[in-house]
């Protein structure tokens, strides 16, 4: 049986056992004159045909046709057992040489597949580093180039919210000020109505005084007419008396002197004139007092009315300015809302485009993961086949080394666990059991 050269070694550990390709001690080796360079031939006088048949069937079942990364290989082994002289005859030597060549070719292909797998891993890492800079694994994602835009958008949204809150605060303050001015206006309006009612009452009093004055003037005119009438009657009576005296006989009698009518009339006239003067003075004094009071109240009411009118004008101007400012703030608010809506729609479209690119990248990553999983499964299968072959080679080495000694063969159990992983999640676990005959002394 020919094995690998002693220049290269390969160690695979499983269940606490290690297998090396350089398995034969240096003292038990004999160099082959017809083998491949770097190979070893071990000759034995006799090997049981059952062992050779078992090894042939094991190789046939352990090396199926497979493809990996575009390279295909096939392995099929057949032996014709001829008894104890299989390894001693020419056909036995050729069969062992063919087996050695096939095993060396298989191990070379395994090494090449391992190298290609390593190259694929490097390419995948390079692809991740190019597509997503600064990452080393499929789960890492870098959104660093979008952080500045997102931060700017967040700052703009926060500024718009602050401006909106400020505008709403100004609007609330303006509403409160308008309500305050409205209350003041209503109070001043009620005061104005009260003053106007007082002015109307004073006007009625003034009209009553004017009517009383007119009535007094009419009474004075009536008294004057009556006085003139009395004077006229007195003159007529005097003329009639004087004319009657001239046409009659004057008879003088000693009698008591009579009252002088003119004096009585003069006294009556003086009394009436004094009474009229007193009434006129009292009426004028009362009228002047009332007129002065009315003028004072009218002046005060006029001043109050003027001050209230000026305050009302100021309030109207303030209300107009506040309404203008309110309209300006509402227009600014609508403009900011439209700008914010446009900005949100624009950046929403950009975020959708970026999300679509991210989805494409994730699909590509999923495909790469599936390919890697498939390659990993094939690699695990080939590794398991290699371990089986190395275990059987070790068994045959022990059998060949103990050709001159007798011992018992003990079956060792080797368990191989195969896990199916998808995105780092274990879907299923399969345990393969292999019985290896080992010679014990």
UniProtKB/Swiss-Prot annotation:
Classification via InterPro entries: IF_conserved, IF_rod_dom, Keratin_I
Region annotation (Coil 1B) ranges: 150-241
UniProt record similarity statement: Belongs to the intermediate filament family.
PROSITE patterns: IF_ROD_1, IF_ROD_2
Name of the gene: KRT15
Coil 1A as annotated region, ranges: 92-127
Keywords per UniProt: Coiled coil, Intermediate filament, Keratin
All copies of domain IF rod, residue ranges: 92-407
Linker 1 as annotated region, ranges: 128-149
GO molecular function annotation: structural molecule activity
Top-level taxon in the UniProt lineage: Eukaryota
Name of the featured protein: Keratin, type I cytoskeletal 15
Miscellaneous comment in the UniProt entry for this protein: There are two types of cytoskeletal and microfibrillar keratin: I (acidic; 40-55 kDa) and II (neutral to basic; 56-70 kDa).
Region (Tail): 404-441
Residue numbers spanned by region Coil 2: 262-403
PANTHER family named in the record: INTERMEDIATE FILAMENT (PTHR23239), KERATIN, TYPE I CYTOSKELETAL 17 (PTHR23239:SF180)
Taxonomic lineage: Eukaryota, Metazoa, Chordata, Craniata, Vertebrata
Quaternary structure, from the entry: Heterotetramer of two type I and two type II keratins.
GO CC annotations on file: intermediate filament
Region of interest (Head), ranges: 2-91
One Pfam assignment: Filament
Ranges where the record places region Linker 12: 242-261
Expression by tissue: Expressed in skin.
Magnesium among keywords: no
